[in-house]
Design a protein with these regions (language model features):
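Detector for outer-membrane/organellar transmembrane beta-barrel domains
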Residues: 114-220
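Active-site rim elements
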Residues: 91-93, 137-138
């Protein structure tokens, strides 16, 4: 049995400025669209390929994150955090100091009564001081690792009620740069991954969708 989440989070009536929130503990942190959601809530049976390669399905580290919702007419949020670095995408922090850090920004809002959107950009960086093994091989990477993510989601509800009918278009793009060594062989390279999916909800009980994901990786020693 593994504990996935155990955290504390400030509420709007906490003695913080309006729009400011703090979250600390172990959680699925802000990174792209899917990471904050549990897998049982996903539209498909498994996570897209970049999530499985870069995040081992999800970034679930220990740390603290602060977010600020800007006082605008549309949804706008910025934030960042410090983390132990014991989970993917870093996986290999020494545990004595923050081994990973993040910053992010996202915007969104209603286009009209039936349509809405959200866009986001995210950065996670850290040092694999303890070494990180790949999900499907025994190569160990030590060095600096940075992950960049952008995401978007568009929703259209023909009736104005997303519980009845909804068409969604969603995608995320990943780029990971590694500068260090693989089993003492010097390596500096960037890999890429992305996915695109569309799901149509016919009614409250039935929906269907399509998804495509792809990876582009450099040669690894």
């Amino acid at each position: 049995v593994e504990l996935e989440e155990a955290y504390i989070q400030t509420t709007p009536d906490f003695n913080f400025p309006d729009g400011l929130s703090l979250k600390a503990g172990k959680a699925f942190w802000t990174l792209g669209y899917l990471n904050e959601h549990h897998v049982h809530a996903d539209d498909f049976a498994n996570r897209p390929l970049p999530y499985r390669v870069y995040l081992n399905k999800g970034w679930n580290d220990e740390g603290a994150e602060i977010t600020y919702t800007l006082p605008t007419d549309y949804y706008a949020e910025i934030g960042g955090g410090f983390f132990r670095g014991d989970d993917y995408p870093i996986k290999g922090g020494d545990g004595d100091s923050p081994g990973a850090y993040s910053v992010f920004a996202r915007i969104g809002g209603d286009i009209d009564q039936n349509q809405n959107y959200r866009l986001g950009a995210y950065y996670v960086g850290g040092d694999n001081a303890g070494g990180r093994k790949g999900n499907d091989d025994d190569n160990t990477f030590k060095g600096d690792s940075t992950l960049y993510v952008t995401d978007f989601r568009y929703s259209y509800a023909p009736t104005g009620n997303v519980r009845e009918q909804e068409l969604t278009l969603q995608g995320e793009f990943f780029a990971r740069n590694e500068d260090g060594t693989y089993d003492d062989v010097v390596f500096n390279g960037t890999s890429y991954g992305w996915y695109m999916q569309s799901v149509y909800k016919f009614n409250s009980r039935w929906r269907g969708g399509l998804r495509y994901s792809q990876m582009e990786t450099p040669g690894v020693p």
